[in-house]
């Protein structure tokens, strides 16, 4: 088992290419959360904005691949489904210092919108990976 997810994989890739990365997420207060944070620190990623949720477990995914190389992914979002705009308000310094903000839709939509609006106000570029696919607000 390895820590991952779209955001985590992208953060590690950018750090390995020499970029400065602050990773914002929410994990459970469990072994998966602790292992993830340790991995990010070993990769040189700023973990100051990894929030811990004592009530919900870390998110997990099970990926199976069939004989035709088609995959099936089952996700239990766990604590990351509770990454709220109030958490991101605590990470405003990271948003302010960022050259680029990379997001995906594995966090609540109101949190995505909060970050996008905050980034817009601060004249920051945002890349949104719209996955998993779901309807987007016009705003």
Tell where the protein language model's regions lie, with residue ranges.
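A generic secondary-structure micro-motif detector
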Residues: 1, 25-26, 105
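Short, acidic/turn-prone active-site loops that include or flank metal/cofactor-
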Residues: 1, 78-80, 130-133
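Active-site nucleophile and cofactor-binding loops and adjacent substrate-binding regions
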Residues: 1-6, 51-55
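Loop/helix-junction capping segments adjacent to catalytic residues or to phosphate/diphosphate-binding pockets
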Residues: 4, 30-34, 82, 109-110, ...
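Active-site alpha-helical elements of protease catalytic centers
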Residues: 4-22
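Conserved N-terminal subdomain of the carbohydrate kinase-like
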Residues: 16-99, 115
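Conserved beta-alpha-beta core of the PfkB/ribokinase-like small-molecule kinase fold
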Residues: 98-139
